[in-house]
Each structure stands twice: as structure tokens, then as C-alpha cells.
Amino acid sequence: MAKKKKFVLSIDGGGVRGLIPVRILESIESRLAHRGVSVPMHRVFDLMCGTSTGGLITAALAAPKPGGAKGEAAATLSDLRDFYERDSREIFSQSLGKRLSRMVINPFGLFDETYDARPLERMLKDKFGWTSMASALTHLVLTAYDIERRRAVFMTNGLESNGSRADDYYFWQAVRATTAAPSYFEPARVENLSRKQDEALIDGGVFMNDPAIAAYLEARKLGWDAEDIVVLSLGTGHAPEKPFPYEEAINWGSLGWMQIAKGVPLLSIFADGQSQTASYQAEHLFCEMGCTRYIRLNGDIPAEAEALDNARPGNLILLNGAADKIIRDNTVLLDEIVDMLIANLHSDNGSPHSGSLVNAA
């Protein structure tokens, strides 16, 4: 029997553009079902890693559903698609009164966060309850940054480099932290359950918008051999046709670089640049190693679809169109991925997640 591979899923940050990786995963799920294999994503992937919106997706697929059946995840891919296409409008919305108030006391979104985090927090509590990351149905890594201790934080249910158990966090708070994009939401105050202390965390996208290399390193910490690891990295789209013109940028000053109306250019450049760099590094690193399989799926999106917070119906149509093109352009590769996944599921002998491949969701 072939040795079981370790499939690792990594998803970038990108706000409402998280709809794109959800659609790609739906395509994989549909292809599996067409081949007679029906399993939840936490059985397909041995480790999931996400930043920001990617953290929300991976956590929802890996967390146990409060009050659900054994092995039932907090959300299905269909649930997540509904969130992006319908519920995200509540997260990224403001009442007329609040918009008028902000125009007076917070022009250009420079002196306070753009959105009230309470609707997001209510949704997260409803979806995750008070379960903690220690109860995850598969290995999981979420990125964040501690603004008080000035350090990168990798929230995981795996192992530290010294072999000890990682710090534990409530799922809903961990997701609130990894999605706390500066200028969009306030920093998250979360409880470190292991250390019995609070931490002030913000979106991991400030240092690692594409967490593929972090996902690989976590896999190695777990003792997995490099030749057994397959990394599937999903992007949230790239807008090559949305430049920041020199003639405008030279007059922005410190406040202009953070203007919400311009899509927060500084954060946009940081996130896009880091994702491109991480993808470049991963592709060449894994190619040079010649042992770990690395697969990156991403694509171009229209300039007007780049905003992290544009949940209007017209923009969702653009994002769905971009996802359709990525899926269409990578049909052969997606079929190859599904072939590998099915072969791997059939070679699963003795895994704690093993069981029937049909109607296992």
C-alpha cells in the first residue's frame, strides 16, 4: 500500500475576496463527489493554515460544530459561500447615521476603525461557540500579530519547536484576531487559555498574508517528512490593473497612505507584496528541495474588485467571475489534485480520521 501523503491547505488573506478560495474548494469537493467520494474538508487536509479571511475559512472547516454530531465541522463550504455572498454585507456595512457621523468626526476614516466589530463577533460566537482550538478536527494554524509584545503569533493546536503543546485559544477569539485588519476593525483582545492572560492581536496579514511557508514549517514540526508533504496554496486574487499613480502618491503624506477611500494603499501594498514574495519563495524553495509538492492557485481580479470590504452584489459577481476563470484555467490541475486526494484517502490506514469515504460528511 502506498505511503500516505500529508496534504496541507494554505489560504491567503483578502477580506470578501475569500469567496475565491471557497469557490476553488467547492470545485474540489464537487469533483470528489463526482468520483463517489464524500468527505468533509478536515478529512481531506491533514493541516490547514490561514491568514485573515483565510483563517476564518480554515477555522470554520476545522472547528467542531457546537452541539453537532461527532466529526461535524462548524461550517460547510456551502455555509461559507453563503457567508461571503450574503452575510458579509452585515459585517461590512454602516447605517446612514453612522456614515454621516463618521464624515464629521472621522473624515476619510483616518481617526477610527471603519467598522464596528460587534456584528462580526456575534457571528463568530454563534458559529464557533466556546470551543477552543485544542478541539480542532485536524491540525490548524492561524496567524496574528501581538501589538503589545511586538511578536508574530501562530495560533495552533500542534506542537511548539521544543515539543510542548501550543497555547490554546477560543476559536471565535482566534478568528476575530486573525481578521482584525488595522483601520478596518479594532485590535482583538483575546484570552490565552494556556497562559491565563489576555493578548492584543491584529490581522496576521501585516506580516504574512500568504502563510504557505508557515504551514510547511508547522508540518515539519509535527514530524512529517518533507517528501510526504503536499502544499495546496490558495490566493484571493491579484489586481494588476489597479496602480497607485506616482503623481498621486507623491502628495499623499502619512495620512494619504492610510485612506480607506483609496483602499488603504499601505496595507494593500504590504499584503499584495508579501503574498507575491511568499509565493515566489515557496515555489523556488520547494522546487530546489525537489521533495515537497507545492501547488499555487490564484488569478487576476478586476481593479474595482480589490477592496477587502466591498460586499456589494455587483462586486460579488466580479469575484465569482474571477473564481470561475481560475477554475476553468486550471481544470487539468484540479483533476490531478483530486486524483491525488482520492489515492491518499484510500491509502489512509489507521488514521484517527479514517472511515467510509462515502457520505462521511
Language-model-detected regions and their locations in the chain:
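Conserved catalytic cores and adjacent C-terminal regulatory segments
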Residues: 1-361
